[in-house]
């Protein structure tokens, strides 16, 4: 059942008024593949635009907080924690992991996915002048905790 459609098939924001407040957490990931030279420049802190990981981390955090402005039927949430981690993965990619949490009436999957996506887009934006062939890959939900549907873990789905 698609919860964002009413009985006439029209889109609407789901009413969560009667749902219980529970702890909710979601973890999402993304990956940016690039030339090894581009990754080395980032890791060595030699990028002319500055600290790529720091800017991408802040962009991801800000994006999580703005998710309801970007995704029309998402509820505005009072996030209590957002963490975005970036790391070099092998010789040619950056791995991004975003974690969002709150105590609330609806989940934070979209916030975690948005954080990971925007962090990846920020890396692309900052590095496109030196590497136009970068690819953003594997944006996915890794884990979801809390709420009526319970625990989801990607490797166990």
Swiss-Prot record:
Subunit structure as annotated in this protein's UniProt entry: Homohexamer; trimer of dimers.
Sites where the protein binds substrate: 73-75, 110-111
Gene field: moaC
Transmembrane segments: none
Keyword vocabulary terms for this entry: Lyase, Molybdenum cofactor biosynthesis
Classification via SUPFAM superfamilies: Molybdenum cofactor biosynthesis protein C, MoaC (SSF55040)
Gene Ontology annotations of biological process type: Mo-molybdopterin cofactor biosynthetic process
One of the Pfam families matching this protein, by short name: MoaC
EC numbers for this chain: 4.6.1.17
Protein name: Cyclic pyranopterin monophosphate synthase
